[in-house]
Amino acid sequence: MEFFESAFWTGFLWPLIIMVAESVLVLVVLLVAIAYILLADRKIWAAVQIRRGPNVVGPWGLLQSFADLLKFVLKEPIIPAGANKGVFLLAPLVSCVLALAAWAVIPTNLGWVISDINVGILFIFAISSLSIYGIIMAGWSSNSKYPFLAALRSAAQMVSYEVSIGFVIITVLLCAGTLNLSAVVEAQHVRGLASLIGLPQLTILNWYVWPLFPMFVVFYVSALAETNRPPFDLVEAESELVAGFMVEYGSTPYLLFMLGEYVAIVTMCAMATILFLGGWLPPVDLPPFNWVPGIIWFLLKVFFMFFLFAMAKAIVPRYRYDQLMRLGWKVFLPLSLAMVIVVAGVLHFAGIAPK
């Protein structure tokens, strides 16, 4: 009993056990969610093309992702003769682990977060910046021209659009007055358009998507480019680079790359939900809307954002590389910089800047 009352147990070991348990729970839930999000992506693409999509494994094809998992795990990983074996195998692990690490600070409900740090937005921004290393390592270590060219493209593409995402974060910071993700959501609950017009229960009007709609569009398109999703999948352009930086990969390493890609996509959807769509807040703070648990609202908004990602893949043709760069540097960069200046000016001169 003395051990369980000691400072070592109460101050270090027990909080550590709780944090590990929370991390494992988030990891399991996230991996299961990714399995069905991948299935939804394939189903949406199939529906646009007027076909059924996966519908054989399990009822309505619900077990298709798990069958694919089994297929990849049971395959033999083949390493090219000229590849750097250590870096070649480390690259998919780096890509996957960095994508999963971002979920340590993402709140899915009030108090539902592993680590509620005050610089959560900067943490995720830093993690997304580091994810390029996995792709560069894969492209260089494969000792092949297609992966190397894809890695160079990816580096330029991600750097170009991270600048715009950074300005988006600054505008949200100006409006919310904090970099804490939970506090950003709460700021959309207590102040905004609904409060100004005297209808505080109509919380949907407080969401930053309305006053910052141009920045929402910039964030959405930049997130597509950041995660190498169509129409900005120049890194994996099948008609040019076969499979891009993943040309030489198969089996479990390829699975880890795909897992990291979809986790990054869901992370961007969650960030859009928190920054612009009010996180776990209901659209109307009245019954029966506020009877629904916050986690349900959060998931619905994340799925809505993913639907937008999937529809972009299904209906928008791929950009040329020069068009991609021009959009990032000549359109989004000036627009986002101008919006930062406008938002700061309006908040200052209207006297509504957060204290």
From Swiss-Prot:
Family annotation (InterPro entries): NADH_UbQ_OxRdtase_su1/FPO (IPR001694), NADH_UbQ_OxRdtase_su1_CS (IPR018086)
Swiss-Prot/TrEMBL catalytic activity: a quinone + NADH + 5 H(+)(in) = a quinol + NAD(+) + 4 H(+)(out)
Alphabetically ordered keywords of this record: Cell inner membrane, Cell membrane, Membrane, NAD, Quinone, Translocase, Transmembrane, Transmembrane helix, Ubiquinone
GO-annotated molecular function: oxidoreductase activity, acting on NAD(P)H, quinone or similar compound as acceptor; quinone binding
This enzyme's EC code(s): 7.1.1.-
Record's GO cellular component terms: plasma membrane
Transmembrane segments: 17-37, 86-106, 119-139, 165-185, 204-224, 262-282, 291-311, 332-352
Any Pfam family: NADHdh
An individual GO BP term: aerobic respiration
Subcellular location: Cell inner membrane
Main location per the UniProt record: membrane
Enzyme type, top EC level: translocase
Topological relation to the membrane, as annotated: Multi-pass membrane protein
Superkingdom as given in the UniProt entry: Bacteria
Subunit structure: NDH-1 is composed of 14 different subunits. Subunits NuoA, H, J, K, L, M, N constitute the membrane sector of the complex.
NCBIfam families xref list: PRK06076.1-6 (NF004745)
Chain's role: NDH-1 shuttles electrons from NADH, via FMN and iron-sulfur (Fe-S) centers, to quinones in the respiratory chain. The immediate electron acceptor for the enzyme in this species is believed to be ubiquinone. Couples the redox reaction to proton translocation (for every two electrons transferred, four hydrogen ions are translocated across the cytoplasmic membrane), and thus conserves the redox energy in a proton gradient. This subunit may bind ubiquinone.
Family annotation (HAMAP family): NDH1_NuoH
Entry's family note: Belongs to the complex I subunit 1 family.
Record-given protein name: NADH-quinone oxidoreductase subunit H
Organism taxonomic ancestry: Bacteria, Pseudomonadati, Pseudomonadota, Alphaproteobacteria, Hyphomicrobiales
